[in-house]
Amino acid sequence: MGKIIGIDLGTTNSCVAIMDGGKARVIENSEGDRTTPSIVAYTKDGEVLVGASAKRQAVTNPKNTFYAVKRLIGRKFTDAEVQKDIAHVPYSILAHDNGDAWVATSDGKKMAPQEISAKVLEKMKKTAEDFLGEKVTEAVITVPAYFNDSQRQATKDAGRIAGLDVKRIINEPTAAALAYGLDKGDNKDRKIVVYDLGGGTFDVSVIEIANVDGEKQFEVLATNGDTFLGGEDFDNRVIEYLVEEFNKDQGIDLRKDPLALQRLKDAAERAKIELSSAQQTEVNLPYVTADASGPKHLNIKLTRAKLEALVDDLIKKSIEPCRVALNDAGLRSSDISEVILVGGQTRMPKVQQAVTEFFGKEPRKDVNPDEAVALGAAIQGGVLGGDVKDVLLLDVTPLSLGIETMGGVFTKIIEKNTTIPTKASQVFSTAEDNQSAVTVHVLQGEREQARFNKSLAKFDLSGIEPAPRGLPQVEVSFDIDANGILHVSAKDKKTNKEQKVEIKAGSGLSEEEIARMVADAEANREEDKKFQELVQARNQADALIHGTRSAITEHGSKVGGDVIGKVEAALADLETAMKGDDKAQIEAKSKALEEAGQSLFAAASADQGGAPGADAGNAGKAQDDVVDAEFTEVKDDKKS
């Protein structure tokens, strides 16, 4: 069995880790970075860019550059959070046929957020494969603890589209606790809080780490959060401030200009990061827009105090879930041994101050907020793969699960913060005389009224024997697996007729859609491989042409005119072939040129005493590595 890799699929950045020699380690991507921007871009020539290359070209291609799609995954288009996001992103968000929030490119190509996330997961998969030197097919992927069933299913689907068998979905704070807890050599029992404020989501979990019969047990006591609170919201506050200040000064609303908005987003994110270590920064965007009077420049000073005032309510919004989680765990702040900060936004001093004030203790600074979650996912992968022994993880379901009963009431069958995996059953009856079928409406949430909770699925149990209302007994059973994904069954206790359903929410992708997306991803991988091979053939041909022309100039007089004529003809043929996309043709014409110029290359080699670089006929082969590196650099420059 191959390695089970750990992936932190983040809103802003993603990270991949593996178990290596008994320790979890983060793997650097092809650019040498330990995290990868969760950004996917579609270029005019049909190329798909992922990560840093996608981020670099975002300013010039805002409508086809997709970021923060994790905030859309598993959500309906009509969700208030999605509607709020539409105003802040330059790309198009629209409703799919089933009501899900999808995205679209400027030429109308519609895609599910799962497809975009799959591209990021593919990049993580490739990063691990390059490091390990073997194929990777299995992964543990992290999600916010407060993700509901639809969002967890959607994340698993993204993994499938990327060609990964997702062995486990694990909550981000729990993963961070694993990374932190295993790093501690002692066997001391401790209760910790993981405060996870990432790019798009916020979670807080209260976790007990205990040594039970030589086994390190991580038990989640309570979790809470907000799946639409994160660094993106902090950035948006800065963007809104800059837009308003510029409008006051110049009378121009930059919200109507996608290019300007994308430049503002980059500048706002940079300014926010700078203000974690500086008291003041300057946002300077020359030629940000233009009107009839000419180009306009944006130059605005931003202080740390102003930034803190802009986001004060967002920071306060993160404290209430901390209070609820502590209360649900039956603990006080004084019972907590340590507070761990996870997520890039926790680097902000004001956030750290708020956490310190609430819990009455300084949060730990020895945990890398960008990498802890991926490391924990890799450890869980090691547990599942048998590489990590004596570790037991007991997670919880973040929200209550139940069904709608008479009068639109939400009846809970599994309470929030119940340790998973778990099963629970409850017996219900009919509401009408001689009722032959019941509809089971499965919901997730905390509100007493069913309509205010998240609808997960509806299914019918038919064939109930006619009887007065209240007599038939229908047993509804809920079964949550270790991924936090729900299976529901309803059984008529008299006839033993049963209806089972693995919750595939009314939102979400059908099996047919997933199969199509998997096939598309496979086709694209093959296409990318062919593209790289074509580029390599072109680069080798280009080096051969350059070497041949040099040989003609320096040594052409030593061979007959007929040889030069053949070489010139072969050169022209190769240059024509290079304008096309036929790799075989380019290789054939390259070979023809090498054969036509054999005597020329021999003369050049003899004249130079076989000096390095004189063998023009092997120019393409000898310099493969150099040419490839040059190609990569040129490509990036073109896209940025």
From Swiss-Prot:
SUPFAM superfamilies: Actin-like ATPase domain (SSF53067), Heat shock protein 70kD (HSP70), peptide-binding domain (SSF100920). GO terms for molecular function: ATP binding; ATP-dependent protein folding chaperone; unfolded protein binding. Gene3D superfamilies: 1.20.1270.10, 3.30.420.40, Actin, Chain A, domain 4, Substrate Binding Domain Of DNAk, Chain A, domain 1. The modification Phosphothreonine is found at residue 201. The keyword Ribosomal protein does not apply. Keywords: ATP-binding, Chaperone, Nucleotide-binding, Phosphoprotein, Stress response. The keyword Acetylation does not apply. Residues 603-625 are annotated as: Disordered. Induction: By stress conditions e.g. heat shock. It comes from the Bacteria. Residues 603-621 have a biased composition (Low complexity). HAMAP family: DnaK. Acts as a chaperone. Belongs to the heat shock protein 70 family. This is Chaperone protein DnaK. The gene is dnaK.
